[in-house]
Design a protein with these regions (language model features):
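NTP-binding/hydrolysis catalytic cores, primarily Walker-type P-loop NTPases
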Residues: 209-250
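Glycine-rich phosphate-binding P-loop
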Residues: 26-40
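A general structural motif
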Residues: 21, 50, 102, 132-134, ...
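Extreme N-terminal, non-catalytic leader segments
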Residues: 1-23
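Conserved catalytic-core segment of NTP-binding enzymes
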Residues: 112-207
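Nucleotide-state-sensitive switch-loop elements of NTP-binding domains
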Residues: 16, 20-25, 48, 54-109, ...
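A conserved segment at the C-terminal end of the G1
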Residues: 37-52
Length: 250
């Protein structure tokens, strides 16, 4: 299907019975909506539940999520860089996932991934069905119209895939996401997925993670007391959000 490459597992983002069986795609198809911070939170959520996690950063131009996690010496965390700009990149991703069947997969999707996802979406879904994996998507949005337009375009390709839309509360309270809240896109989302609220975190925490390129796991013991307390508050709220979408992992 990708020429000489062999299709195998793809990314599903469902926890259901086992963390290791899901493949997550934090997306949004544009920059600046909070996909990277969401990926930080999702990896932390999995590690806190002792799941095996395979982090794949597809933003090869600015792989901040990869750089923040690659030096963590944890036996249950693997980190990879993988461009999805062409067919070979998608095939490489599938081969990587096949090699780690007992790992939950977190894909930090680059903003430019929309075009290739549209091109290879049907192949991806077919591969998942063959491997008996289920695809679910986290779609992070801000309050702008293009977030809704990009979501609608994505829904046209992935009509049968559960999509969890995450209102990034950094951009305002949930009630202020007027265009999404009253949209037909939301109605479609909530037939198979959920509308979630991704909690805002204090600037001092975000600055610490980004400026030092540190994972949550590595940063926590080094933070000043107040910063660490805010991080812990935010982690707790994020965990409740992930539990509601994925089911409590055990």
């Amino acid at each position: 299907m990708f020429g000489h490459k062999t299709l195998t597992d793809w990314r599903a983002i469902c926890i259901f019975e086992k963390c290791e069986r899901f493949f997550t795609l934090p997306g949004g198809s544009k920059g600046g909506v909070g996909k990277s911070l969401f990926s930080f939170a999702l990896v932390d959520y999995l590690l806190s539940r002792n799941a095996n996690a395979l982090l794949v950063d597809t933003d090869t131009d600015n792989p901040d999520v990869f750089k923040a996690h690659k030096d963590l010496a944890l036996p249950n965390l693997l980190c990879r860089l993988n461009s999805l700009d062409d067919a070979d990149g998608w095939a490489d991703l599938l081969d990587t996932v096949q090699n780690y069947p007992d790992y939950a997969v977190v894909i930090n999707a680059a903003a430019r991934t929309k075009t290739s996802t549209t091109s290879y979406g049907d192949i991806m879904k077919e591969a998942l069905r063959e491997m008996r994996r289920e695809l679910t998507v986290f779609w992070i949005i801000n309050r702008h119209r293009d977030s809704i337009e990009l979501l609608h375009s994505f829904q046209e390709v992935f009509t049968d895939v559960p999509i969890h839309v995450c209102r990034n509360l950094y951009f305002g309270e949930a009630r202020r996401f007027d265009m999404y809240n009253s949209s037909k896109a939301r109605e479609a989302v909530e037939k198979n997925g959920m509308t979630l609220d991704f909690p805002a975190v204090g600037n001092r925490v975000a600055d610490w993670l980004y400026s030092r390129r540190m994972s949550i796991r590595a940063a926590q013991p080094e933070m000043p007391f107040g910063t660490r307390a805010e991080l812990q508050r935010w982690r707790g709220v994020c965990a409740k959000m992930f539990d509601s979408a994925l089911g409590e992992a055990s």
